[in-house]
Amino acid sequence: MKFEFEFELDKMPTTQQQKGIKKVKGKLQFYDRRGTNNYSLKAQLMKNKPKECFEKNVPLKLSVTFFYAIKQKKRWWQWKTSRPDLDNLMKNLQDYMTKLRYYSDDSQIVWLEAKKVNDEKNRIEIEITEV
């Protein structure tokens, strides 16, 4: 079974590292800084959710490409080497996909392919394939 889709976003997702930490009454509290809620990412993942979850214990390949909008046309399709870190973006995305039941558990992913590229528009391409 193979499931693939893509969607555009006004703002690209943020990572946990971009969230804030403050000390209140001697205890650390984590909070969402303005713009770190990822509502549009969650909404798009809910909208594109597969009808059936991939079965438990089925090994999966997850391929994701994050396209970041930039104005300089000559830099489109070049690698994005600046922040956010790709591994943090992927962990965030995989957590949402697990919660939304794209697959039973993210331990099913045995093959992970991820890329960050500059492009004309902010968008994400996702492909999940049984291995």
UniProtKB/Swiss-Prot annotation:
Keyword tRNA processing attributed: no
Keywords: DNA damage, DNA recombination, DNA repair, Endonuclease, Hydrolase, Magnesium, Metal-binding, Nuclease
E.C. no: 3.1.21.10
Top EC class of this enzyme: hydrolase
Pfam families the UniProt entry points to: RusA
Keyword hit for DNA repair: yes
BP GO annotations: DNA recombination; DNA repair
Protein residues bound to Mg(2+): D85, D87, D106
SUPFAM superfamilies: Holliday junction resolvase RusA
InterPro entries in alphabetical order: Endonuclease_RusA-like, RusA-like_sf
Role played: Endonuclease that resolves Holliday junction intermediates. Promotes DNA repair. Exhibits sequence and structure-selective cleavage of four-way DNA junctions, where it introduces symmetrical nicks in two strands of the same polarity, though it can also cut branched DNA structures that lack the symmetry of Holliday junctions.
Name the UniProt record assigns to this protein: Crossover junction endodeoxyribonuclease rusA
Organism annotation: Lactococcus phage r1t
